[in-house]
Amino acid sequence: MASMLVQHSVKDFAAWKKMYDSVADLRASSGELSDQIYRDASDPNKLTAIFKWDSLANAQKYAKSPELKAAMEKAGVEGPPNIHFLNEV
């Protein structure tokens, strides 16, 4: 199973979360199986997300999608995200 780990900061967590939740169907239709969101203990606007995907190819395709880029901009993501693709062992 493939995973995608994403880290970024946001301007406002509540605004980001609203936008994040609004694209849940897009993520699912792209192959996302599950997600976990974490907030940094010292800065609640620093986020780490771990997503499980049906395939590495779908995770990589979604990460490059214009829909994701637009959603991140609208949600107030600050700077480019750090994205890592992982394979479960």
Where do the model's predicted regions map?
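Short S/T/G/P-rich N-terminal loop/turn motif that feeds into the first structured element of a domain
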Residues: 1-67, 74-89
